[in-house]
Amino acid sequence: MFLSIMAGVIAFVLTVIAIPRFIKFYQLKKIGGQQMHEDVKQHLAKAGTPTMGGTVFLIVALLVSLIFSIILSKENSGNLGATFGILSVVLIYGIIGFLDDFLKIFKQINEGLTPKQKMSLQLIAGLIFYFVHVLPSGTSAINIFGFYLEVGYLYAFFVLFWVVGFSNAVNLTDGIDGLASISVVISLITYGIIAYNQTQFDILLIIVIMIGALLGFFVFNHKPAKVFMGDVGSLALGAMLAAISIALRQEWTLLFIGFVYVFETSSVMLQVAYFKYTKKKTGVGKRIFRMTPFHHHLELGGVSGKGNKWSEWKVDAFLWAIGIFMSAITLAILYL
């Protein structure tokens, strides 16, 4: 445990040192920054804020994880197979996000990768994770509240759905200052507790390291944000959470621990479906939420959508509290 804490502190310090240099480089090169939703007017002032900050905390987390995982394995208390499985997912999804951000920022291609291109790359990455790290482990049953449902090779489709789905869910959640970074920290702390109780110290190590790196990033990402993580960070973090839940054989827990991401994604899907349905029935499309993902709905009028506008800090606090509450419920189900 001491080794994990030390590694987490190192990741925090390195990220805090590296991010200002990344921001300075970004500004010196006059690289185009983040584009904002015009519908949320309080965000317009953020236009041009450096993005792709996830590149920094991912590089730090991956390097520190690699070094300390090797140290841990030499002490005969670590499993490099599980560690490399999770880290490979983080790396590959980070590369996909980096490519998407690069096209948006450096090539001035507004949408970056097309949805078809991004989904294809994510599916390929998910398949690599399954065939290289999941299939050799012999895992073919889904844990549903402690009951294992044997699905055989259909587990491959579940892995794809889980990893791709949550990578995009965290990506959707990353819409206001600090929301995604601390939401993921809350999720990782919860999985850290689960890993500790399972004596999976190899997984605990990389969890603590990513927590340290994310907290270092949050120093510059809280409101008013000096840098955003970009798709490079959010896609990698979502995939990491999915991979951890699979590695710990606690797949179902991510529906609770990741409730905020699930709800954010569901709000978008419901909004689109309801708009299309009402337009087909009445000729006029109607909306359930003021704007999606859900955090924008809160910004524009609170929970009801009809109240006063919420500040980003208030939205953050509300959704972080939900994340903590759902994580506590998960731990209660597991251990009480």
From Swiss-Prot:
Its cofactor is Mg(2+). It comes from Streptococcus agalactiae serotype V (strain ATCC BAA-611 / 2603 V/R). GO terms for cellular component: plasma membrane. Keywords: Cell cycle, Cell division, Cell membrane, Cell shape, Cell wall biogenesis/degradation, Magnesium, Membrane, Metal-binding, Peptidoglycan synthesis, Transferase, Transmembrane, Transmembrane helix. Belongs to the glycosyltransferase 4 family. MraY subfamily. It catalyses: UDP-N-acetyl-alpha-D-muramoyl-L-alanyl-gamma-D-glutamyl-L-lysyl-D-alanyl-D-alanine + di-trans,octa-cis-undecaprenyl phosphate = Mur2Ac(oyl-L-Ala-gamma-D-Glu-L-Lys-D-Ala-D-Ala)-di-trans,octa-cis-undecaprenyl diphosphate + UMP. Disulfide bonds: none annotated. This is Phospho-N-acetylmuramoyl-pentapeptide-transferase. One of its GO terms (molecular function) is metal ion binding. Coiled coil: none annotated. The chain crosses the membrane at residues 3-23, 52-72, 79-99, 123-143, 144-164, 175-195, 201-221, 227-247, 255-275, 315-335. Catalyzes the initial step of the lipid cycle reactions in the biosynthesis of the cell wall peptidoglycan: transfers peptidoglycan precursor phospho-MurNAc-pentapeptide from UDP-MurNAc-pentapeptide onto the lipid carrier undecaprenyl phosphate, yielding undecaprenyl-pyrophosphoryl-MurNAc-pentapeptide, known as lipid I. Pathway: Cell wall biogenesis; peptidoglycan biosynthesis. Its main location: membrane. InterPro entries: Glycosyl_transferase_4, PNAcMuramoyl-5peptid_Trfase, PNAcMuramoyl-5peptid_Trfase_CS.
